[in-house]
């Protein structure tokens, strides 16, 4: 009975902590939809996969979301035609590479500024490498969920319009953007889950460009779309929080902590602990600070770098974009790179 009470308390704390950031991510996703010209966004993204992954990793400075809110924004990037390396880089690095988290880490480790610097450097490096690795997969069908793949197939990123193109191309662009406004925004393709065929003759008269709407109408659409996505993602977040709480209660934490003495085992323990506790990146530095006297600096960095990338609460959200095999590869690559980087620190630096 005591474990049940503890589990319920942890579940509520995770949910209360995560929901505001999920709401922020959904709101940013809606703002991207209605106020960002996706054609210009795609045009400005680097075509080089390595540079694109690096740029995507640094976008977190502009969109300060944690691991609870980065998934909706990364999904919006993908369906707006942003290259996969950019989206992957943002997905993995945004929870760490943002001003709020950097400030919180500096506050916690004021006496160890190298922790702050290395957390940013390692997060950028790992996200860039993984994004670059995924750039070799040209066909996205094996990576993303079928609904995402269908949408990207029927709504390819718009190209700069040439003089020889008529009004049909412009109408298609407007329909492509506003296709996301229908019911089932997050699932894609409306109530039936079927992508809308983009054809100038089939565009309803209500689908007019958002650029022609007044600010009040745009804001109303932003609110409506945010409510729709929050309703669809909230249930997934609740399930993920419940799983994370169950793991925290049932996992033998005393055994895990007792293994944190060696340079290798301490990193493994903190990697496992990062997955188990599923704490938000805005406050995880204070949690890691409590282990500073017993764990090596490399293992603390492993917790601070790997934790925001791999959060149990967000696995359900990621499954709405990627297939399970893709998420496994993301997790495995992130764990291996984090282990190698932090082990080098434990053996040769600290």
Where are these regions (language model features)?
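Membrane-embedded alpha-helical segments and adjacent helix-loop junctions characteristic
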Residues: 1-75, 218-277, 286-287
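Hydrophobic transmembrane alpha-helices of multi-pass solute/ion transporters
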Residues: 1-18, 162-230
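Juxtamembrane and boundary regions of transmembrane helices in multi-pass small-molecule transporters
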Residues: 46-47, 111-202, 317-350
